[in-house]
Regions:
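Short alpha-helical elements
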Residues: 1-285
Length: 285
C-alpha cells in the first residue's frame, strides 16, 4: 500500500494562498487552452473574456471559494458583472474543467514524487458541514449534531482526491460512499480502500466486491482518543485542508455539482501552489 508522504511544510507561511495565486490562475488558463478544441463555442452577442479580463474572472472565482464571498460582492470588486462570473463558473463546471485540471495536477505531483500514475490503495472518509436553508440538501447528523450536508472523499496517500461525492448529512457513511466507489471503479482502480468502522456491512461489502474494491475498516483510536491507524490520517489532513476555504465551511450551493466544483477548486489551489514551490526548490538546489 505504501506509506504516507508529507513533502510540504505546515507552517503558516505555507498557507499564504495569495502569495502563489498566479500559479492557480496560470494552471486554469493552461487547461482552458487545452480544452479549446473540445468545448462548444460560446453563443451570444458579447465576445468572450480574454487576456487580463479572463485572468481577473478566474481570480474572482477563486476568491469566491477561498474567501467565501458572495457572487454579487465579488462582481462589484472586480468590475465584472456577477452574472458573467457565475455563468463562467457554471459553464466550466458542466464542461468538467475543474475535474480535468485536478486529475492533471495529481498526475504531475505523483510523477514529481517518483510514484506510479495510479495509486495502489486509497483512503476514504466523510465530513459533515452546516448548510444554509437554500442549499440543495439538508439532513441532521445525529453523531456530530450538525444539520447540513456530508462530503464523502477518497484520497491517495498524498491526500489528493480521487473521487468526491456529497449528500445530506443524515445519510450513513456506508451508503454515501457507494457513489465514491463507482467513481474509483470508473478510474480503473481495483484494490484496497481504507476507512473507519462506519464502512461496514454486507451491502457495502457486496458493492465493493462487485467493483473489485476491498473495503478495509479499522478502529479510529482506543480509550476515547482519536488516533487513525496506518495512513488513515492522510484523509483527515485533506479534510482539514479544505476547511481553510470559507466557501466549504457553511454550504450555500444549490446544486451538488457546484459544491463538488468548489471542492475541486480548493484542491487545485493547493496542488498548483505546491507544484510551483517544488519546481522552485529544484531550481535553487
Amino acid at each position: 500500500m505504501g506509506t504516507a508522504f508529507n513533502p510540504a511544510k505546515t507552517s503558516l507561511a505555507s498557507w499564504d494562498a495569495f502569495r502563489d495565486v498566479d500559479a492557480v490562475v496560470d494552471a486554469m488558463l493552461a487547461e482552458l487552452t487545452a480544452m479549446a478544441g473540445t468545448k462548444p463555442t460560446r453563443r451570444g452577442p458579447k465576445p468572450p473574456l480574454a487576456g487580463a479580463a479572463l485572468r481577473k474572472a478566474i481570480l474572482a472565482i477563486w476568491c469566491v471559494c477561498f474567501c467565501g464571498m458572495q457572487w454579487r460582492a465579488i462582481g462589484q470588486l472586480c468590475d465584472i458583472p456577477f452574472g458573467t462570473l457565475y455563468s463562467l463558473f457554471a459553464r466550466w463546471t458542466r464542461l468538467g474543467l475543474w475535474r480535468r485540471l485536478l486529475n492533471r495536477l495529481i498526475l504531475a505531483w505523483r510523477q514529481a514524487c517518483g510514484d506510479t500514475p495510479e495509486p495502489s490503495a486509497v483512503i476514504v472518509d466523510s465530513r459533515s458541514c452546516r448548510s444554509a436553508p437554500t442549499c440543495f440538501g439538508r439532513g441532521f447528523d445525529g453523531g456530530k449534531k450538525i444539520k447540513g450536508i456530508k462530503i464523502h472523499l477518497a484520497v491517495d496517500k498524498y491526500g489528493f482526491p480521487l473521487a468526491i461525492h456529497v449528500s445530506p448529512a443524515n445519510r450513513h457513511d456506508s451508503k454515501g460512499i457507494v457513489p465514491v466507489l463507482h467513481q474509483l471503479a470508473g478510474r480503473g482502480f481495483k484494490g484496497t480502500a481504507l476507512g473507519n468502522l462506519s464502512y461496514r456491512g454486507q451491502r457495502l461489502s457486496r458493492a465493493g466486491e462487485a467493483l473489485g474494491i476491498a473495503i478495509q475498516p479499522s478502529a479510529g483510536g482506543h480509550g476515547g482518543t482519536f488516533i487513525p491507524e496506518g495512513i488513515r490520517w492522510v484523509v483527515e489532513r485533506s479534510l482539514a485542508w479544505i476547511s481553510r476555504y470559507r466557501r466549504l465551511n457553511t454550504i450555500f450551493e444549490r446544486t451538488e455539482g457546484h459544491l463538488v466544483a468548489f471542492i475541486e477548486i480548493a484542491f487545485i489551489s493547493i496542488l498548483s501552489r505546491r507544484l510551483v514551490r517544488l519546481v522552485t526548490q529544484e531550481i535553487s538546489a
